Curated annotation (Swiss-Prot):
Function, in words: Catalyzes the decarboxylation of S-adenosylmethionine to S-adenosylmethioninamine (dcAdoMet), the propylamine donor required for the synthesis of the polyamines spermine and spermidine from the diamine putrescine.
Pathway: Amine and polyamine biosynthesis; S-adenosylmethioninamine biosynthesis; S-adenosylmethioninamine from S-adenosyl-L-methionine: step 1/1
Cofactor: how bound: Binds 1 pyruvoyl group covalently per subunit.
Gene (name only): speH
Family to which the UniProt record says this protein belongs: Belongs to the prokaryotic AdoMetDC family. Type 1 subfamily.
Enzyme class: lyase
Biological process terms in GO annotation: spermidine biosynthetic process
GO cellular component annotations of the record: cytosol
Species whose genome carries this gene: Pyrobaculum neutrophilum (strain DSM 2338 / JCM 9278 / NBRC 100436 / V24Sta) (Thermoproteus neutrophilus)
GO MF annotation terms: adenosylmethionine decarboxylase activity
Name used for this protein in its record: S-adenosylmethionine decarboxylase proenzyme
Lineage of producing organism: Archaea, Thermoproteota, Thermoprotei, Thermoproteales, Thermoproteaceae
Keywords: Autocatalytic cleavage, Decarboxylase, Lyase, Polyamine biosynthesis, Pyruvate, S-adenosyl-L-methionine, Schiff base, Spermidine biosynthesis, Zymogen
The keyword Lyase is annotated on this UniProt entry: yes
Length: 124
């Protein structure tokens, strides 16, 4: 029971599936790195490091940022026009939904499935 009686919300998590994205942006490592960096700013998160991994010469990409408040990631499957996005932040000063929405605006999917959750700590 997330956020129930006696719970303190310590983090907010939004993640989703993006369908019908243009293949070119999903293959563009430099563009995806820039998008993740900007998403960290939009979320008001402190960027600590960023990395990426390409799965073969024509394969998809994983781009991830470690932020002081947790993480942001994009995983792509260009051959399917598909990406997954994950934004998790701790602290009231951050806005993971704003970061998620920013990434969606840049990847321009035809369809988005978004899921929200909180991470709660229960007092004993």
């Amino acid at each position: 029971m997330a956020g129930g009686v006696g719970a303190q919300i310590v983090g907010r998590h939004i993640y989703g599936n993006l369908y019908g994205c243009e293949q070119q942006i999903l293959k563009d490592e430099a563009a995806l790195i820039t998008i993740v960096k900007e998403a960290a700013k939009v979320a008001n998160a402190i960027l600590l490091s960023i990395g990426s991994y390409r799965f073969g010469p024509e394969g998809g990409l994983t781009v991830f940022a470690v932020v002081a408040e947790s993480h942001i990631s994009i995983h792509t499957w260009p051959e399917h026009g598909f990406a997954t996005v994950d934004v998790y932040t701790c602290g009231d000063h951050t806005d993971p939904k704003a970061a998620f929405d920013y990434i969606v605006s840049k990847l321009k999917p035809r369809k988005v499935e978004a899921f929200f959750g909180d991470r709660s700590m229960y007092r004993e």
